[in-house]
């Protein structure tokens, strides 16, 4: 039996490799880990408690807030504020960023952007849901109040990013820019334990994930790419398999381990796509690039986009490098008019 390594031990060991490390990021990741355990507990008993269903209100995205959305948002906010290693957060569930104003928080150097519970509308039918997080160094001076500009940074400036998938087992996957590692929660000891070390996404995959019910609304480039995926060709091992859960974390997690592409394109009713650049796309882009994959808006690198708004949306193509590059080629050939570079 191999030695069990907890996430806490793993992070401390990695920190020891950098003598100048102060431990603030280690403490911050510990806070996220703690909140994930609390949310996991509530999800596991959701069917027995009065937390399934909607609150009857909408969040800033215009989506009906689920009770667990609100619960998860509050738990992560509380955990991140408690230790003072974060000066503020931006959440998919909040209209504006949240500033933490304790003396310790104001002098901290990190901000966190988070989707507290991705896919929560599926919780009452027992489909896996998740949490997505992203960490940046603030741009404003420590000791001052956090500003909007601290959050509106391109993804290539991320310090760390990760997600938690709450499913048949609960798993936390993260990167600090030195590879991707996954930790599975062991409820018997209350710890996340290293289960997937140095995750690498296959360069080529056989899975495509997209909501084909929206096919009629897709750009021509996406329609042509889907046709390519469905055509038989032994040389390229086609047709590919279609797998779509409707929870970004779950679909991304499967494709990360098995190889594949996840697509949420623009549409006639959503010209900028649906997914949020800051809360969903950038964190997953950082992870997939660190694992050897690629993330794009169909024409260019997701992490090079300069955000202009907290809740900005973007088309999204993420997964195995060769699959994403092939999808980009179809977009350039058949949907070039949608490329922002070609628009005034």
Curated annotation (Swiss-Prot):
Annotated binding of substrate, by residue? 118-121, 211, 244, 274
Entry superkingdom: Bacteria
What cofactors are annotated for this protein?
Answer: Mg(2+)
Provide the GO MF annotations for this entry.
fructose 1,6-bisphosphate 1-phosphatase activity; magnesium ion binding
What does the entry list as the binding residues for Mg(2+) 2?
115, 118, 280
Which EC number applies? 3.1.3.11
Q: Where does Mg(2+) 1 bind?
A: 92, 115, 117
Residues spanning the signal sequence: none
Q: To which pathway does this protein belong?
A: Carbohydrate biosynthesis; gluconeogenesis
Main subcellular localization, coarse class? cytoplasm
Localization in the cell: Cytoplasm
Q: Which UniProt keywords apply?
A: Carbohydrate metabolism, Cytoplasm, Hydrolase, Magnesium, Metal-binding
Q: Which Gene Ontology cellular component terms are annotated?
A: cytosol
Q: How is the cofactor bound?
A: Binds 2 magnesium ions per subunit.
Statement: the UniProt record of this protein carries the keyword Hydrolase = yes
Record's Pfam families? Answer: FBPase (PF00316), FBPase_C (PF18913)
Which reaction equation describes what this protein catalyses? beta-D-fructose 1,6-bisphosphate + H2O = beta-D-fructose 6-phosphate + phosphate
Database matches in InterPro entries: FBPase_C_dom, FBPase_class-1, FBPase_N, FBPtase, Fructose_bisphosphatase_AS
Q: Which GO terms describe its biological process?
A: fructose 1,6-bisphosphate metabolic process; fructose 6-phosphate metabolic process; fructose metabolic process; gluconeogenesis; sucrose biosynthetic process
Q: Which family does it belong to?
A: Belongs to the FBPase class 1 family.
Q: How does it assemble?
A: Homotetramer.
- Protein known as: Fructose-1,6-bisphosphatase class 1
Species name = Aeromonas salmonicida (strain A449)
């Amino acid at each position: 039996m191999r030695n069990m390594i907890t996430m806490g031990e793993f992070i401390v060991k990695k920190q020891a490799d950098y003598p100048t490390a102060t431990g603030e990021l280690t403490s911050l990741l510990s806070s996220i880990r703690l909140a994930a355990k609390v949310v996991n507990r509530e999800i596991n008993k959701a069917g027995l408690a009065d937390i399934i269903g909607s609150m009857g209100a909408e969040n800033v995205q215009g989506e009906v807030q689920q009770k667990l959305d609100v619960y998860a948002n509050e738990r992560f906010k509380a955990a991140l504020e408690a230790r003072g290693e974060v000066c503020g957060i931006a959440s998919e569930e909040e209209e504006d960023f949240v500033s933490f104003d304790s003396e310790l928080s104001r002098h901290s150097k990190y901000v966190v952007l988070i989707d507290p519970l991705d896919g929560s509308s599926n919780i009452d039918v027992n489909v896996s849901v998740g949490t997505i997080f992203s960490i940046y160094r603030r741009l404003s001076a420590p000791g001052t109040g956090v500003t909007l500009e601290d959050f509106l940074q391109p993804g290539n400036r991320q310090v760390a990013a990760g997600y938690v998938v709450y499913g048949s087992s609960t798993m936390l996957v993260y990167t600090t820019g030195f590879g991707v590692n996954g930790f599975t929660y062991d409820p018997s000891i209350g710890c996340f334990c290293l289960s997937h070390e140095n995750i690498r996404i296959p360069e080529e995959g056989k899975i495509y994930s997209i909501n084909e019910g929206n096919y009629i609304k897709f750009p021509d480039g996406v329609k042509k790419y889907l046709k390519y995926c469905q055509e038989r060709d032994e040389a390229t091992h086609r047709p590919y398999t279609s797998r779509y859960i409707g929870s970004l974390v779950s679909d991304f997690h499967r494709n990360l381990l098995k190889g594949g592409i996840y697509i949420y394109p623009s549409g006639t009713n959503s010209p900028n796509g649906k997914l949020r650049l800051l809360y969903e796309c950038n964190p997953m882009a950082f992870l997939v690039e660190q694992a050897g994959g690629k993330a794009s808006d169909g024409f260019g690198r997701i992490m090079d986009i300069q955000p202009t708004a907290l809740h900005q949306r973007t088309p999204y193509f993420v997964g195995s490098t060769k699959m994403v590059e092939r999808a980009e080629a179809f977009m350039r050939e058949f949907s070039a008019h949608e490329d922002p570079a070609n628009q005034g």
